[in-house]
Design a protein with these regions (language model features):
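Hydrophobic alpha-helical segments with transmembrane-like composition
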Residues: 5, 14-121, 228
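Central hydrophobic cores of alpha-helical transmembrane segments
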Residues: 59-71, 131-142, 211-218, 270-271
Length: 290
């Protein structure tokens, strides 16, 4: 329901600012960040089905390895699958349709957390004892990632998760380079996730508040992006200067979207199911005991 509401909303916004010429509500191609909502729905559905199997530790590990294998090879076949579906079933099918490729690409990260026990999570969260060391490792790792993304062809496209090999392999590069790049993707992304988990604090702060309000921040942050795209004052800036500016701008944007007032004002459209339940309870006859 959240996807339907905000897909409609953002399609209308894109029409107003002129990014699309015709106002249509294409629900098969998620706009901007909404791919995650679609992918999350598929992952939750699969998780519910797997939960019914009552898997033991070996079963969970086996299923995870299978899912990781599917994810690992999926981008090798993306272009062929897209072409096959376009020719035989749906001409407008792409790797973006219903977040098809990203659902497969990022599936291991969701199920790594899904299958992990609370005890394992606790050990990971507390494995770096010194917060200063963790912070230095994270900053250095992020710096290296920026260098890698800038210096190696197709790495950014690889991390986006939505493209086939034509976007991250040069002509003539084969399965060996594919395996190397995809492995590096999972290792680096997993390492950054590990560092972020260790930097998370149990103490109440503005960051934990933003974490509690992450859905609202996530849903509405494209409004700031669309606004910046309509301005031209950064057009002559270098990429690094733009990056620094965007990082600075993200702070007040997150502050506003994560504020109590904004969250309170948008809670019903961000959580439509809860709103529906409250309305049912509110209008339920007082003498109706059932």
């Amino acid at each position: 329901m959240v996807y339907l509401i905000f897909q409609t909303f953002f399609r209308y916004i894109l029409y107003i600012i002129g990014d699309i010429e015709t106002l249509d509500y294409n629900f098969l191609r998620p706009e901007f960040h909404l791919w995650y909502v679609v992918s999350l729905s598929f992952w939750y559905l699969l998780a519910i089905l797997l939960n019914k199997l009552n898997l033991n530790t070996f079963g969970k590990l086996s299923v995870f390895i299978i899912l990781l294998g599917i994810s690992f090879i999926s981008r090798w076949y993306t272009d062929g699958i897209v072409e096959f579906v376009q020719e035989n079933y749906y001409e407008e099918f792409t790797s973006y349709t219903l977040s098809y490729q990203r659902t497969l690409s990022f599936m291991p990260f969701f199920f790594a957390g899904f299958f992990m026990t609370k005890n394992t999570f606790t050990k990971i969260y507390s494995s770096i004892k010194n917060i200063k060391i963790g912070t230095v490792l994270f900053i250095c790792s992020m710096f290296l990632v920026f260098l890698i993304v800038n210096d190696f062809y197709g790495i950014e496209a690889l991390y986006r998760g939505s493209f086939g090999t034509y976007r991250f392999l040069d002509d003539g590069q084969g399965v060996t380079v594919y395996i190397t790049k995809v492995i590096s993707h999972y290792i680096i992304a997993g390492w950054l996730c590990y560092l972020i988990m260790n930097l998370a604090s149990n103490k109440k702060s503005i960051f934990t508040k933003w974490g509690d309000h992450s859905l609202t921040i996530f849903i509405f942050h494209p409004l700031a992006v669309f606004l910046l795209r309509q301005t031209e004052f950064m057009s002559d800036w270098t990429p690094n200067t733009k990056l620094a500016a965007f990082l600075l701008i993200s702070i007040p944007v997150t502050w506003i979207l994560g504020s109590n007032n904004f969250v309170k004002g948008t809670k019903y459209i961000c959580n439509p199911y809860n709103f529906f339940i409250k309305m049912v309870v509110h209008f339920k006859p007082a003498n109706d005991k059932n």
